[in-house]
């Protein structure tokens, strides 16, 4: 179970972080970069000061380094892919250096052992297949699994004003309206109105910058579930979220074949227990848990996707992703776990 010692993470820390990282949305990440701490507190049944103190704690220990604001992927028809590859551990460092040079790489999540996730952006099926095959070849991958996160559909038009506001908030999504207004040369009222519209239309999302090695008495882990097709994926996902409610910080659902659940666990035995338990659920073909060793974030290297000439002429600011109106938010259920 989660530790309660001073300086260590507990269930409240995890749930507060999950509320900001994903919230109740079915999207892979939160589509509300300005969600109020009061709303989070009310949803969790705690006070607003506790929410602020827990976030300050996550920042203070170095785990949560900041947030980045991006445009909804569906606005450009690009897609994010999370590719899990099993590699030769002796070549991991060289492989990472090679992967960092590839275009469209957003993040590399290195696991303890012989696996890693490579997150990259792709424009179409052809380029997706080409990039995935190249990564697998570079890794000498013995096996791989492709997960394709689904973002909400969005067709809102973005003006130059919207683009400037988004850029001003790119590295600080909670920047004060007055500060943004001064930076972009618009009134605070205009900034507020425009941003509220973008949030309402699900045109933007936030992604955190994290350092898993900074956690004390806990570990970040990735639970990958392969569905068997004998049970609806929604039913399977809800059961997993209910069973692991105290340790899930993010659920990537919507892919017909796989579900990815990011966890924070405090016992190494959970690495064995969780996949064994989840693997016994109806509708699950297999489950595996990998402990995160390191996380390399290359969000700024994606800037080229925002500046391509043909895109800039058609829209004020590009985005990158694939939408799916079919994804439904998993139900939240109160439960306790021992992970």
Label each PLM-derived region with a short phrase.
Residues 1-339:
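A compositional/biophysical signature of low hydrophobicity enriched in polar/charged and small residues
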């Amino acid at each position: 179970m989660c530790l309660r010692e001073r300086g260590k993470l507990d269930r409240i820390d995890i749930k507060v972080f999950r509320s900001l990282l994903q919230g109740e949305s079915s999207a892979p990440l939160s589509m509300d970069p300005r969600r109020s701490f009061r709303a989070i507190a009310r949803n969790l049944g705690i006070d607003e000061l506790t929410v602020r103190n827990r976030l300050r704690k996550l920042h203070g220990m170095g785990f949560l380094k900041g947030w980045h604001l991006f445009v909804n992927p569906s606005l450009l028809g690009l897609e994010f892919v999370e590719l899990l590859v099993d590699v030769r551990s002796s070549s991991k460092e060289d492989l990472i250096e090679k992967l960092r040079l590839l275009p469209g790489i957003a993040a590399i999540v290195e696991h303890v052992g012989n696996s890693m996730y490579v997150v990259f952006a792709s424009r179409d099926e052809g380029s997706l297949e080409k990039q995935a095959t190249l990564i697998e070849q570079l890794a000498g991958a013995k096996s791989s699994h492709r997960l394709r996160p689904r973002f909400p559909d969005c067709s809102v038009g973005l003006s130059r004003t919207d683009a400037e506001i988004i850029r001003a908030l790119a590295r600080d999504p909670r920047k004060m309206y007055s500060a943004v207004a001064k930076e972009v040369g618009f009134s605070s009222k205009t900034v507020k109105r425009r941003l509220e519209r973008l949030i309402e239309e699900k045109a933007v999302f936030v992604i955190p910058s994290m350092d898993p090695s900074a956690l004390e008495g806990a570990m970040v882990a990735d639970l990958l579930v392969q569905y068997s097709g004998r049970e609806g994926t929604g039913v399977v996902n809800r059961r997993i979220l209910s069973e692991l409610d105290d340790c899930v910080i993010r659920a990537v659902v919507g892919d017909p074949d796989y579900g990815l659940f990011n966890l924070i666990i405090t016992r190494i035995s959970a690495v064995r227990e969780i996949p064994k338990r989840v693997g016994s659920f109806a509708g699950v073909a297999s489950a595996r848990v990998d402990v995160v060793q390191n996380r390399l974030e290359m969000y700024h290297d994606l800037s080229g996707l925002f500046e391509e000439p043909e895109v800039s002429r058609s829209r004020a600011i590009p985005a990158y992703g694939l939408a799916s109106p079919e994804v439904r938010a998993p139900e939240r259920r109160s439960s306790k776990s021992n992970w």
